[in-house]
Amino acid sequence: FGDQPAATEILVERVGPGQADPLPLPAYPTGEWLAEDIGGKGVLDRAQSTLVLGKDGAVTGSGGCNRLMAKVQFERSGIAITDLAATRRLCEEPLNKQEMRFFKALTAARQWQLDDATGKLTLLDNDDRVLVVLSRK
């Protein structure tokens, strides 16, 4: 029409089956875990430091002497365990030291890795240092 440029029409059509699938999220490591190593120092045989990571963000468990409660947030391979509180039972010294290492490691954790071959869960800090290695209970 006169001196106006011709209009260009672009049609876009999706090719392929179904709707676009969102990126798959990792299967977060919820469930009950038993500490096998804390800070590279192993664990006491007679004490069980446990962790239960709930799908609802609740954390419960035991340092080996005292019960713990906290909150957890996952973001892909990231983890944040916050608001950790524990009962205040008197524990013998070796167990008390292990428990304090466990609690400190949990709140310092920023990344998680799940080894498909062994099923072990490893919690790491921001510098990729291993804080805790856990197995399914």
Task: Locate the predicted segments by residue.
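Lipid interaction determinants
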Residues: 1-137
